[in-house]
Structure formats: structure tokens, C-alpha cells
Amino acid sequence: MKPIPATPDHLGQHQESPRRKDKGEAESERQRTRERLEATLAGLAELGYLRHRQELLVKSALTPGAPTHGDTATRAGDTPRSLEEKFLEDNILLLKKQLNCLRKRDAGLLSQLHELDKQINDLKIDVEKTEEHLETDSRPSSGFYELSDGTSGSLSNSSNSVFSECLSSCHSSTCFCNPLETSLNLTDGQAKSADDFLEWLDYRDSQHETGTVRRSFSAPHSNSVDVAADVHPKYQCDLVSKNGNDIYRYPSPLHAVAVQSPMFLLSVMGNIKAEEPEEEIGPNDNDDCIVPELDHLKDEDSFLHQSSLCSLPLSSGKKMDGYILSIIQKKAHPVRTNKPRTSVNADPGKGILRHGSICVKQTGGVSQSSTVNLKNSKQTCLHSTGMISVDNSTYPSLKQCSKESLSEQLESKRMPSISTYPSCNVNELQSQNNSRNTVKSVCQGLARGSVAMTSNVQKENVTPNAPTNLSNASSSACNGSPRESTQMSALLPQEIKVVPPVKKISPKNTLLSYHASSSFDERPPLDFKSEGSSSQSLDEGLLVNAHYIPAQQQGVKLHKNIKNVKIVKSSTLKHRANVQYVAENGSQTLKEKSKAVGKKCRFPEDLDTNKKVKKSTPRTKKTSHPNFEPAVVGRNPVAVRSGIKSHGQPKDVVLAKPKHKRGDYRRWKSSAEISYEEALRRARRRAQREMMGVYAQVPFPYASPYAYIASDSEYSAECESLFHSTVVDTSEDEQSNYTTNCFGDSESSLSEVEFVGESTTSSDTDESGGLIWSQFVHTLPMQATATAELQTTAKAFVKIKASHNLKKKILRFRSGSLKLMTTV
């Protein structure tokens, strides 16, 4: 019986699979019927042989005529004895050969085969159920079950499994009869019960002793001529029960019945053509082969086979191997589900966490201004920072940042506002409109309305409106620290409602306009935690209360600041920040004064204005700073502590949290695989070494040159916190490329622009000049559309004194300042 191979058509074509299945079932049914008929014929032939042999025995006993009872008994005894001797000799030879064959076999193979039979039993049951289910199932067939049907060569029903166990035990009992191997290779699509077989076993137990054979001529393995001609030799071997205790001798009535049983049929199927002609032995030869005296060979009786079995051990072994291989193949190719073995982590938070500047939380602003929606805040955040704003759920740390930003905003609202802002508001509105329309307008607004913006922001801080807070939020978003970014995002929603047109502007213009608008619109208290002292100086500047300064005056000083920037030389932003912390407590106060009370971070315009304000009114700085001191403490205790440490004056304490911020930034950097701490330490060391020199360069007209520089230059760093501080720190170490690349292109470009605008004003008095880089970047996009003032400022920006590596990169990519960091 040939198994039906699983062809692609069978596996894939829905229409043909049922047709092929039906065809296979019909063929298997015909095969089973054929086998059953053959088994029945074999049983009948065996019974006929037994009857014929019995007749011969009776005739032999009665032939002498009428001898005396004793003579008859004696002759009968002599005749059987001579026959028994012959049979015994032949059987002994066969047994020896079989034992030799068994020695060559691996004993473990038989046990494994037995286990496989058990497994096959389970498989047969499963296949049986599956086939029944598939008959009514519209799903395409995989071909696995078709392979297992009656024509595929696998045992598929409980009867077969039971009988296969029998055969396996027979095998273990050294039964080399081909039926074993054939049965192992046979398959049946019909479920057949083993009850009949069990009944036969019980009947045999009642008739015979277990494992013993009566001393009679019915025992020998012999085939009549009819049997040899009509019955396949596979039906002419002994059947052994699964436990090996029950043996059905070939020429016995029970054997004939068992051969006809469906179970036996299934177990024996498929081996017909494997038999060799030697099995077709005449009745006389077979009678000679087996003798009743084999009873004493009880253990060896289980090995009794046809005389030809001894010559077939090799073929039987091959069949067994083939059967085992077939089982292994079927078990080695189980049906597999389409479910992917691995799950793809689509959590955007993990990838975003690597970019510290991306972490911007915008929910904080919602509470302050219900009119602003998160979407607008996100867009504003993107424009200001050039980064993707992250949802609150993305960063757990952002939640804390948003909370802090809210508290800071509330405090900023509480802060007293300076009464000199009406004109500033007008200027601010104009600057906002200009920034919305064009970058040029934005540049003009920056020149004219930085002070106005600052004063206006102070007003806004006093009022419950969150626009100032939004500005702070945006600036904090520019900063890399998660907390600051969160604050920025919180504030951005409100600020957005004022600056929505900025979205329409081109990337560079948008950034510039956003800076202008944010600086003009609001200077909300934002904690910019740039690395090193930049964040501290920014915070100080935020805390300072500044008197309103006319926009024109601010513009004039802006030019001056730019010139100063050219002159100033600082190794890094951090260095400048350190100098500012040490020497610019007073200037910081002035800067803060120029800023709105609630402002924490300053935009480039505000920074310049603050510087000018500080220069022009150091008194105001000093006076206003005390007003901010409580707010500073309330807003950010950590910043206050850091400010106290750096300045030694709680009054001048800045909200900046350099260490804490550095920790946050380092955390982001570590996720981006950037060793930020090392760069920061190097920047600090450089700043300390150059602190004295930078300090000398700082304009002393301000009571606290540090406050001026720190607020401006460090504000730039703060706004750029993640990006700029990282660039500065690493650029000195010539690692800016790596750091910059870690940030997104949009992120770095946006941060760059913002930083430029901010550091334009801040680095005017920036002794270290480390922040001039950002000024340069900011002014480059502004120069095209900026006024003459901005153009002059741009020139100053061109001469940036940052790390040599950073400066080189900036000059190289002047035209594409937005893409400076990413391209570098």
C-alpha cells in the first residue's frame, strides 16, 4: 500500500484537497478490505491445514488395521517420537540462528520501539479525531492528516495501536515475523476496537497455559500447499501479545481467528510484498520445521517463526528502521502556528528616552490655560526645541517635571509685577505678529522688543495667564533636562495660542520666530538646567526683577553685547557659567530684574535686554532681586541651594539646578549611550581654569557680571540645555559629533537656532564666550531677514569662541545652522 504524498496542491489548493482526500480514503478502504479478505483467507487456509493434518494423524493411528491397543499405542508413540525428533532438531537450528540475529540487534531499540508504538497510539487517536473534524471543516488542509490516513503508512486507530503494541512486544520477544515490521509501517483510516482481540486473548488463556504450547502436531509452523499458494507468508507467523506472555502459534485455530481480526489486519498491512519466497514452504517441510517438543523451549517459543524467518532478519531490521524513520519524520514536522516567536516592542518611550531633548511634557500648561490645547502646545514645542514632544505617559519623570513646573508657575504668578509694561506689551504684540509673518519681522521684534517682552512676561507672570509659563515651558523644553522639558511642555500650550502662526514659518524661520514670540510674549519662570553653571545663571536671571527698558535701548545694547561677544573668549558654556556663578551674583540679579518676575529662562532678546538693564540699572537689579528670592526658594529649593553654594549669597541664589539637571541630562545621555558626565566634568574643569580670565572679560558695569553673563549665555545654554550644553561639553573634547548625532536632526537644529538667539544677548557679556556659538547659529537664520542690528549681531556670532572643534563645525555649516549638529 503506497502512502499518498503531501503535494503542494494537496496542501495549498482548497478545491483539490477534498477531492484528493476522498480519493485517498477510497483507496485506503479498498486496501483495508483487501487485507481483511486476505487475512480471512489465511485463516481459512490455516484451519484447513489443521484439519488436514489432524486427519493424517487420525489415519496414521488407524492405518495399522486392528492392532491391539498396546501395539497401537506403541506405534503411535514411535511415530510421533520420530517426527518430534526431526522437528526438534530443525527448531533448535532455527532458534540458534534467531539468537544470533538477536545478539546483533540493539536491545535498546526494542524498548524505544515500544515507546514509539505508544506514542503512535496517541497520534492515531488524534489523527482519527482530526480527520473526522476535517470532513466537516472548510479550512484548508495542511496535508499532515492526509499523510496520516489509511494510505499514508501511519497507524491511525486504537486497534492498530493496541496491536502494534502487541507486535512491539512480539519484537521484544525476538519475533522476527514480518508482520511486526509490516504492522509498524501499516496505517488504517478506520477506527477499530480491540475488544475482539482481548476476547480472543481471554479465550486463549482459558484454553491454553500462558506462554506454553501443547505437545501436538498443531503446534508446528507449517503451511499446507494451499496456504503457501493462497496466503501471504506474513499471516503465517506467530502472534505475541503486547506483554509477551501470550503467544498465538501459527498453525492454531486461535491464530487463524486472530489473523482475521481487523486489528491484526491493520498491524500486518503493507508487508506483503516484503516477504520472500522462502516463506512459501510446503506442508511437509513446515511440519518438519516445528515439533510439539518445543514446549520446553517456552522462552524460545516466543521466537518461533517460519523456517524462512532466520533468513529474513536483515530485511525485517530494515523495515523496522524504515518504520522508525517514518515515525520520526512525522513527529519532527509538527504543524506550526503562524504566531510570531518574538514580540516587537513598539514602545516609543524607550527610543525617545535616548534623546534627552525630546522629553518635553506639555500637560502642565493645560491646567493654567484651559483655552490652549495639547496639540498646539506640542506643535509649539516642536518649533521651539526642534524636537518631538513626548506625551506625558511616555516619560514617568516628566510627570514630576510638570508638577514642578506648575508649582513654579503658580509662584511666578504670585511674584510682583513691574508696572512699566504697557509699552512693552505693544512692542511684544508687534514682535509676535512679525515673527508670525516672517523671520525678518521676528528679528526686528527681537531687536526692539526683548525688553518689552521681558516686562510683558513679568506682567503675564503676575496674571493667571499661562503664556509666560508656556514660554518658560518652551525654553525648558529647549533645555535637555526632563524636569525642565516637562515644565516647558506644560507652559507651551498657553504660549502656543499666541504663537500659532510660527508653525507656518520654515524650520529656521519658525525657530527664530518662536524664540522671538516666546521671548516677546512671555518670559515665564522656566528652570533651564543646562549642564554646568549655565542653568544656574539662567535661573538667577529669571529670579531677578527688571525694570522696563525701551526696546530701542535694548537694541542698542544688543549690538554692544554682540561686540562683547566677539571679544569674549570662553572655552565652554560651563566655564562661563562657573565664572558667572562666582563673579556675577550682582549682574545675575540685574538680569533677573530685567526679566519678568516669573521668568526662569530668557530668550536671546530678553537676555540682551536684561544685560542692558543690568548695565544701565544695577540698582534695579539689586532691589528687584530680593523680591524674587522667596519665589526662587519656593520654586526650586534645589536651585536655590545650588545658587547659594555657587554665590554664597542666598539672595542671589539661582533656580538653576546644575547638579540635578546634570543628573537628568546624564540620564538621557546614558540612554543615548553618550558619556555626558565626563564631558561635563571636563567642561567644568576648563571653566574653572578659565574662570578668572573670563571673569576679567565680563563687563563689570553690572553689579554681577555673572548674573548678566550667566543669565544670557547660560539661558542660551538652558534653552539648548540638552543639545547645547552637550555640544559645548563634548565639543571641547571633540566629541560634539557623537553627542550631536545622538540628538535628532530636527532636535539639534531647533535647539541650535534657539540657543543662538538666546546666547546672542547672553554672550554679549559672556566672558567665557562659550555660548557665542549658539548666538552665531541663531543669528545666521535671522541675518537674511533681520534688520541691520541683527546683521551686526550676526557678525559677532560668526566669531564664536567655543571649543575649537565646535567652532570649526559651526563655520563649516554656517548656511545650514539648523542642521549644524546633525550634519556634523
Swiss-Prot record:
A motif (PDZ-binding) lies at residues 821-824. Residues 1-34, 61-80, 131-150, 454-487, 516-536 are annotated as: Disordered. GO terms for biological process: Wnt signaling pathway. It comes from the Eukaryota. InterPro entries: Dapper. Residues 19-47 form a coiled coil. Residues 11-34, 520-530 have a biased composition (Basic and acidic residues). Residues 2-343 are annotated as: Interaction with tcf7l1. Its main location: cytoplasm. Keywords: Coiled coil, Cytoplasm, Developmental protein, Nucleus, Wnt signaling pathway. One of its GO terms (cellular component) is nucleus. It is found in: Cytoplasm; Nucleus. Pfam families: Dapper. The keyword Coiled coil applies. The C-terminal PDZ-binding motif may mediate interaction with the PDZ domains of DSH (Dishevelled) family proteins. Interacts with dbf4, dvl2 and tcf7l1. Involved in regulation of intracellular signaling pathways during development. Specifically thought to play a role in canonical and/or non-canonical Wnt signaling pathways through interaction with DSH (Dishevelled) family proteins. Binds to dvl2 and regulates the degradation of ctnnb1/beta-catenin, thereby modulating the transcriptional activation of target genes of the Wnt signaling pathway. May also bind to and directly stimulate the activity of tcf7l1. Belongs to the dapper family. This is Dapper 1.
